[in-house]
């Protein structure tokens, strides 16, 4: 205890000497330092707590702003998101539909859970318009080669082409999606595309027929059938490669039957367009060539009439 008191007294003397040398210096005790440090620590800690709470509140506010209510399916806002694509995305999906190969899933590699209706809508509209126009141009070119052919514009082909293409691009995917959804209940491991993804796959698969229809203007029958077969093979292969990951876990009979029906319906569409819009001309469009009518035996020809002589 004596040693401690001597040390304290010695420190007090040193402090007194320092004060004597610098009387204007400010003095603070150790307790004041500790109190101020504790106060600073409390203030800093409370500031950090308030900052963290503020950041959490900001995050919650941003999440609430991001989670906007989804529009109803009967409103235009609901379908607006399906047309929100740029040119590069549409071109990439068209390229994917033109170059199918095994192991390349169109939905997984090109749609990426973002199906669009912009591409299928305009592809169907373009195909219907090109079918009607080229069907009429075929008659015009035939009339130029053979003047005996009578041509009249067939505007009803525009309506028929539009109804056929749009019904196929929407009703067939609807039936296919419904069947796969029904089979999903019996086979729990089966994956399933959404209805809009199925429509998108069918819409882009029809793009290959647009240049094919233009090439059908070449007036060579075997070449037209060759172009049609190539287009059908590319388009049907894209559908089969895309649907195979969905149906492969089903029974072999169901998978084979479903893919066969898909290819058959695709072939019927191509065959129907070829035979209807590029069919041979009916007989009422061919004007028969004028034929020479033999003169009646009772009619005297001018050369056989002899002038009368007068006496």
UniProtKB/Swiss-Prot annotation:
Residues in compartment: Cytoplasmic: 2-120, 181-198, 248-252
Ranges of the Lumenal topological domain: 142-159, 220-226, 274-311
Modified residues (N-acetylalanine): 2
GO CC, alphabetical: Golgi apparatus; Golgi medial cisterna; Golgi trans cisterna; late endosome membrane; trans-Golgi network; transport vesicle
TM region(s), chain numbering: 121-141, 160-180, 199-219, 227-247, 253-273
Superkingdom of this protein's organism: Eukaryota
Membrane topology: Multi-pass membrane protein
Record's keyword terms, sorted: Acetylation, Endosome, Golgi apparatus, Membrane, Transmembrane, Transmembrane helix
Subcellular location: Golgi apparatus, cis-Golgi network membrane; Golgi apparatus, trans-Golgi network membrane; Late endosome membrane
Single GO molecular function: small GTPase binding
InterPro entries: Yip1_dom (IPR006977), Yip5/YIPF1/YIPF2 (IPR039765)
Summary of subunit composition and partner proteins: Interacts with YIPF6; this interaction may stabilize YIPF2. May also form a ternary complex with YIPF1 and YIPF6.
Protein family per UniProt: Belongs to the YIP1 family.
Name this protein carries in UniProt: Protein YIPF2
Organism whose genome encodes this protein: Rattus norvegicus (Rat)
């Amino acid at each position: 205890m004596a040693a401690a008191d001597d040390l304290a007294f010695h420190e007090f003397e040193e402090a007194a000497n320092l004060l004597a040398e610098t009387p204007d210096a400010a003095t603070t005790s150790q307790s004041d330092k500790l109190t101020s440090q504790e106060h600073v620590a409390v203030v800093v800690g409370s500031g950090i707590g308030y900052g963290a709470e503020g950041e959490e509140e900001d995050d919650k506010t941003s999440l609430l702003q991001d989670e906007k209510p989804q529009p109803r399916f009967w409103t235009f806002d609901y379908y607006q998101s399906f047309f929100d694509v740029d040119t590069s995305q549409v071109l990439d999906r068209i390229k994917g539909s033109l170059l199918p190969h095994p192991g390349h899933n169109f939905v997984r590699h090109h749609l990426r859970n973002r199906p669009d209706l912009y591409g299928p809508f305009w592809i169907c509209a373009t195909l219907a318009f090109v079918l009607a126009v080229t069907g009429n141009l075929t008659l015009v070119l035939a009339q130029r080669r053979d003047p005996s052919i009578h041509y009249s514009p067939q505007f009803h082909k525009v309506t028929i082409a539009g109804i056929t293409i749009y019904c196929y691009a929407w009703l067939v995917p609807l039936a296919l999606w419904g069947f796969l959804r029904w089979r999903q209940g019996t086979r729990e491991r089966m994956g399933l595309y959404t209805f809009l993804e199925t429509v998108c796959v069918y819409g882009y698969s029809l793009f290959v027929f647009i240049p094919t229809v233009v090439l059908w203007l070449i007036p060579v029958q075997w070449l037209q059938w060759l172009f049609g077969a190539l287009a059908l093979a590319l388009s049907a292969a894209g559908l089969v490669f895309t649907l195979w990951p969905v149906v492969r876990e089903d029974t072999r009979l169901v998978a084979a039957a479903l893919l066969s029906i898909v290819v058959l319906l695709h072939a019927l569409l191509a065959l129907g367009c070829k035979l209807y819009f590029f069919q041979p001309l009916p007989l009422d469009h061919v004007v028969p060539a004028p034929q020479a009518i033999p003169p009646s035996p009772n009619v005297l020809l001018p050369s056989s009439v002899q002038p009368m002589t007068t006496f």
